[in-house]
Amino acid sequence: MPWGRRPTWLLLAFLLVFLKISILSVTAWQTGNCQPGPLERSERSGTCAGPAPFLVFSQGKSISRIDPDGTNHQQLVVDAGISADMDIHYKKERLYWVDVERQVLLRVFLNGTGLEKVCNVERKVSGLAIDWIDDEVLWVDQQNGVITVTDMTGKNSRVLLSSLKHPSNIAVDPIERLMFWSSEVTGSLHRAHLKGVDVKTLLETGGISVLTLDVLDKRLFWVQDSGEGSHAYIHSCDYEGGSVRLIRHQARHSLSSMAFFGDRIFYSVLKSKAIWIANKHTGKDTVRINLHPSFVTPGKLMVVHPRAQPRTEDAAKDPDPELLKQRGRPCRFGLCERDPKSHSSACAEGYTLSRDRKYCEDVNECATQNHGCTLGCENTPGSYHCTCPTGFVLLPDGKQCHELVSCPGNVSKCSHGCVLTSDGPRCICPAGSVLGRDGKTCTGCSSPDNGGCSQICLPLRPGSWECDCFPGYDLQSDRKSCAASGPQPLLLFANSQDIRHMHFDGTDYKVLLSRQMGMVFALDYDPVESKIYFAQTALKWIERANMDGSQRERLITEGVDTLEGLALDWIGRRIYWTDSGKSVVGGSDLSGKHHRIIIQERISRPRGIAVHPRARRLFWTDVGMSPRIESASLQGSDRVLIASSNLLEPSGITIDYLTDTLYWCDTKRSVIEMANLDGSKRRRLIQNDVGHPFSLAVFEDHLWVSDWAIPSVIRVNKRTGQNRVRLQGSMLKPSSLVVVHPLAKPGADPCLYRNGGCEHICQESLGTARCLCREGFVKAWDGKMCLPQDYPILSGENADLSKEVTSLSNSTQAEVPDDDGTESSTLVAEIMVSGMNYEDDCGPGGCGSHARCVSDGETAECQCLKGFARDGNLCSDIDECVLARSDCPSTSSRCINTEGGYVCRCSEGYEGDGISCFDIDECQRGAHNCGENAACTNTEGGYNCTCAGRPSSPGLSCPDSTAPSLLGEDGHHLDRNSYPGCPSSYDGYCLNGGVCMHIESLDSYTCNCVIGYSGDRCQTRDLRWWELRHAGYGQKHDIMVVAVCMVALVLLLVLGMWGTYYYRTRKQLSNPPKNPCDEPSGSVSSSGPNSSSGAAVASCPQPWFVVLEKHQDPKNGSLPADGTNGAVVDAGLSPSLQLGSVHLTSWRQKPHIDGMGTGQSCWIPPSSDRGPQEIEGNSHLPSYRPVGPEKLHSLQSANGSCHERAPDLPRQTEPVQ
């Protein structure tokens, strides 16, 4: 072949292979992904239409239905008798069962209506099956050994097979035209054609109790007793009896029923009183649905879904109504339906076939007597509606108009309004709504129930409407509820000592993060980078990690205390938190570098927090002295009080971003409330049904609440509070509920982070990244990379593409190895159905909040959770720190006990992850206070400073060293981020001035951070260097402050003493105390002139004497003279004043001076401590000087006439003031 033609052939081969793979991919998608497991919501993919599956099961004498997620639980038949077996016909929406007590075959519609008898049956019926293609019912008569078949009405019954040995447990596959049954006596499995021919024995085994088919995998499953009487195992084989396999399951004891659908197995266990769901290949991913009443074991179990009963006939024989509606466009306004008898098109109701029989045209119903309307009729395409003039109202029958006369006092308690008619009060509804079944409440687009629509209600005509959904949501089969398209949502939550997630139906229940968690009560999810942000309450920091638990990174380690709430702004790219220890609301960018306080005034104990990025507002709860719910802008301004009345401890808070509705829970009142974002239209949603609520989350039609009273997660309808379902499973304290789904946080753009993973072009579409390629390229198989158009498609890695898209149901069922023993593989979610009291196999009340009930179907016991030990009948926390069971290094950390675990807090000089502690290299990080030019040497838990080979004191500089310069040859500063040791691709790798270096021994790159920063990329601000650097200055400053304080204190003491002395002196002068020498008699014995002074001194304190001084009189020339011992006496006395005229009185009396006399004498008064002071302050004497007894002789020598005598005064005189 010429080389020029080869590109043409290559292109043709490329197109053929591409077409083949595309067809294979589509087929695999339709046969694989469109084979939804019972918990796979196929409508989310947008490609597989169909209703969600539900379960039908017998329980005692009743038959009920329930969704796999535990919702919509209701009884279809109250009294079904003793049912031997049952089956359904999905297309005809019928349920058939045998009442062996009444010996009849009965049927009812799947909604529980239309109960009727089909035919009589034998008493020993042991199995029932329905051929949904030929519309026939088959049952097994074990006593007579026959298999009987009849039509759906029971009129044409006939024996299909006879002479069988105790047949039981029949199952059919109408597509393959085969039926299967078992024999109890021989323990064998048999097969035959549905016509009753080609009977074949497949296997001979023992103890077959349950038999069922997986029509999608074309395999036969049965339960076989082990022979030991306590265990039963699930076996399977193909339709030929080959490829027998044993299926491993966690609970496989005494199975009473089982059913398969997709990759799931549904089964019930005797004495377990529950329905179990698990992966049919591995037995893992288990969910338990506890039923109500819980004391009756479920019997027969079936999955109701169109793919559980697939059909093969063509559209002409059995047309698909949905397909015909899509093909009915040539009928113009009407939707055409195919008449199976005439094979001609018939118009839908409200339309008629045109005369040329080519299209459908509208019928004008109002043209014929207003079609029953009393006062007015309006025609609409395909229908009509009655109208009323002003002043009249349309009655609930939709045809009669009545004059608007209001009822007095609304006696009928109508939800909207009441009109008085001749027949009495009648409730009326606004335009667009109709009266409900109770005759009082209204439903419709103008009513509070929004017409039953979960999102959008579209009025069609008065009394008629239809539901629609927001972009990204799909309308479900009930034509009312909406479900998010895309991946199945995950519920992410903190569990005190770990972080977990599960699907809404309890599947995929796993632990994401468990190591070194301490205590976690606050977390949130970033849909842009797909990361989890969470707060470590015990270790007092904020971390983030990937959704798979990898790449944990500490963001904020300083400035936070008791973190209880966390919220992420996925549009503004910031995080916010509540800190009850510091009584603040804080915020930061996602790197944790720039964090600040948002709210710190008028706030007590903030707990829950939520952010509305589009409204640019924060909402938080406060559980302090004045409980309240508040709102503010993202900067902390414009604070608004949302609610403050009827609150005790408002804890969790969340926002419904589709309806702008605020939800919060009150822990102490056990109440869930809702309101608008401004606090208006506040109403109570749930009360006393949620135990101890802590946090909330809302998505689709559901509101999720975490309960600490019974550690679990509760789901209710977000508008009504009904359909309560409780999910639990080895939980401790579930909190911070977060829904992970692209639509859970509207407006998120994953293309902002690493281009959404796309190589070329990224387009955001409903929260997901859509990758496109530039011209000349095509997308690779991963949907993200782009390849040239001429890239060889038949490469080795793409040759096995068919294996990658093969349906899971077609994979082999080899024996699955045992569990790996990890905690994530043993988690079992348990669904508690609404309306039932909490009870499990371990008895009423369960095992408490710190234990779980473990049942094997026969027996049950309580097992304490990890970190707890049995203490009597309860499980108590193990204090690993006190019992020395922790792994905390004693030399570098301190153990802190937490509920169910512990954490290690590193000592100064170390850092760690909550378990291990590592030495900090202060020298490399620059977190030291060695003086300028001094050398720093790292040590374990610290560092040393040296200066030219000798130790240097911290903070001092070395004089002979020169600091390395950061200047280049041109005199400019070097760029630290372009260090020669790193390639250009690392430009910008080191942050905050860090220098990138290449370590040859490790062949890796690292950052040398400047002083004040630390971390792998110098991303963490570290202020410890400042404290260390200024420690010496701080000590000097402290000494100086102490010295100044001491001096000031001494001065204050001196001033105090002087003030005290001055005050006491003044007080003594004004109020003299009593003389202790005064006797009560008042007499003082006097001595004669010859008495010595020693006698007087012996009886009283030393006396005081006064010598008068006369001022010098220049005229008389008198001059003072000194006496002995310094005493001063008058050498010359004035004629007008003689010495004898002065009497020295007692200290209580004023000095007394007589006139001149011949008898000169001196009186020595009793001594007193205040004698001289009293005399000194007396103004009667011109001058004086106090002297002691030693100077008395000197005085007497100068005045020889002086002698002692007692005073004889008529009265006492008060001291001179």
Curated annotation (Swiss-Prot):
The UniProt entry, under InterPro entries, shows: 6-blade_b-propeller_TolB-like, Cueball_EGF_LRP_Nidogen, EGF-like_Ca-bd_dom, EGF-like_dom, EGF-type_Asp/Asn_hydroxyl_site, EGF_Ca-bd_CS, Growth_fac_rcpt_cys_sf, LDLR_classB_rpt
Provide the leader sequence positions: 1-28
LDL-receptor class B repeat ranges per the UniProt record: 93-134, 135-176, 177-219, 489-529, 530-572, 573-615, 616-659, 660-702
Q: Where is this region: Disordered?
A: 1070-1096, 1164-1217
According to the record, the residues making up region (Not required for full biological activity) are 1024-1029
Which PROSITE patterns did the record assign?
ASX_HYDROXYL (PS00010), EGF_1 (PS00022), EGF_2 (PS01186), EGF_3 (PS50026), EGF_CA (PS01187), LDLRB (PS51120)
Ordered alphabetically, the record's keywords are: Disulfide bond, EGF-like domain, Glycoprotein, Growth factor, Membrane, Repeat, Signal, Transmembrane, Transmembrane helix
Recorded hits in CDD domains, A to Z, give:
EGF_CA
Q: List all topological domains (Cytoplasmic).
A: 1059-1217
Glycosylated residues in this chain: N111, N410, N810, N944
Q: Name one GO biological process term.
A: positive regulation of phosphatidylinositol 3-kinase/protein kinase B signal transduction
- Which cysteines are cross-linked by disulfides? C366-C377, C373-C386, C388-C401, C407-C418, C414-C427, C429-C442, C445-C457, C453-C467, C469-C482, C751-C762, C758-C771, C773-C786, C842-C853, C847-C862, C864-C875, C881-C895, C888-C904, C906-C917, C923-C936, C930-C945, C947-C958, C982-C996, C990-C1007, C1009-C1018
Q: Name one GO cellular component term.
A: plasma membrane
Task: Read off the SMART domains from this record.
Answer: EGF, EGF_CA, LY
Membrane-crossing residue ranges in chain numbering: 1039-1058
Q: How does it sit in the membrane?
A: Single-pass type I membrane protein
The record places the following residue ranges in the Extracellular compartment, namely: 29-1038
Enumerate the spans annotated as EGF-like domain. Answer: 327-361, 362-402, 403-443, 441-483, 747-787, 838-876, 877-918, 919-959, 978-1019
Extent of Low complexity compositional bias: 1080-1096
Which GO molecular function entries does the Swiss-Prot or TrEMBL record give? Answer: calcium ion binding; epidermal growth factor receptor binding; growth factor activity; guanyl-nucleotide exchange factor activity; receptor ligand activity; transmembrane receptor protein tyrosine kinase activator activity
**Where is it located?**
Membrane
- Give the function comment from the record: EGF stimulates the growth of various epidermal and epithelial tissues in vivo and in vitro and of some fibroblasts in cell culture. Magnesiotropic hormone that stimulates magnesium reabsorption in the renal distal convoluted tubule via engagement of EGFR and activation of the magnesium channel TRPM6.
Q: How does it assemble?
A: Interacts with EGFR and promotes EGFR dimerization. Interacts with RHBDF1; may retain EGF in the endoplasmic reticulum and regulates its degradation through the endoplasmic reticulum-associated degradation (ERAD). Interacts with RHBDF2.
This chain's protein is named Pro-epidermal growth factor
Write the lineage as a comma-separated list: Eukaryota, Metazoa, Chordata, Craniata, Vertebrata
